[in-house]
Amino acid sequence: MKKRVLPVCFILMAFVSGPGVWAQTTDASGDHTAPSYDMKAQSLVDLERVQKKFVDLANALPADKMTWRPSTDSRSFAELFLHVAGERYAILKLMGAAAPEGFDTRAFEKTTTDKAKIVDELNKSWEFSKKTIDGMTNADFAKLIPKLGPQANAGDVVYILVADAHEHLGQSIAYARVNGIVPPWTAEAQKKAAEKKPEQK
């Protein structure tokens, strides 16, 4: 699992048909099969779920595991979590969000190996992401960002953030499993399943 640099070529989705794409409503024909879809709300729900898993997993790690890495050319646990936090600033900056003063993507992930500080950085970057996306309307998702490509828009940037979060969550789970650490949400599900078994007999 080698270090990945923020992609310069994005897979851009077809979000260029105008605000009507983001807020579908039923028409006079009485077609009620296409309910409205709130892109902002859905992206925030998805990102918040992933954020909770990152924090829960970081808190579940023994402090001395923060410097563990699967190979010399891979990120450590600490670097991976800080990379996640840093990419929130870097990705949302693509659509004009202001990252913290003096923020440097590459340097940021090497700033600390302290577990409490890492969790704090995950929380701060999540609040930044939430505030940025909360400040958008669904129509804003369709706004073009020419510097990213002729059809690229703000919605693409948000979904790059969503995809990136899931990618690194999977990476962090693999790190944990290699070290014999069961993700807390999985452990909780297993516990509930075990408690139900006696009731089923």
Regions found by a protein language model. Give the residues of each.
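Bacterial N-terminal signal peptides
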Residues: 9-20
